Amino acid sequence: MNQSAKQSRLLAVSLSTWGFGYAVLEGENSLVDYGNKRINTDKNARSLAHIEKMIVHNQPDVLVLQDVNAKGTHRAPRIKQLHRKIVALAKNRKLKVVEISGTELRRLLLNNEDGIKQEMAEVLAKKFPDELASRLPEKRKAWKSEDARMDIFDAVGLALNHRNT
């Protein structure tokens, strides 16, 4: 890894029906900021506004998103529309955009394309125990919705995936 890659700052955003999760990674693997933002009304416009504020505040070199158009990825039309608007916003701000498929993410974190989100979250909680261990949701029951905190782990995974490729 070259010196400039070690010093760069990444903003990774994981979109969901709840809102979005985010992670800011600096240097090799320093988790500077992370969290999730729940958006209840006017989801796309409000999500876009929050993400723009994060770009202005964090001044990342790269924006990392999940590739919503990758083979095998099923995302709601609203999420795909928001994704396009975020890419346009980033390009308008001359920000490099990297898109990573869910398959690539699982391959890097689990060495297995068929792994599940809970397994990825557990790996990330071990990698960043001080930051993420207390936010690790319990294993989801089949009849329950995914915990909104999973968006944080998705975002951290996206950032690490880009950093380590």
Language-model segments: which ranges?
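Phosphate- and other anionic-substrate recognition elements at nucleic-acid/protein interfaces
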Residues: 1-165
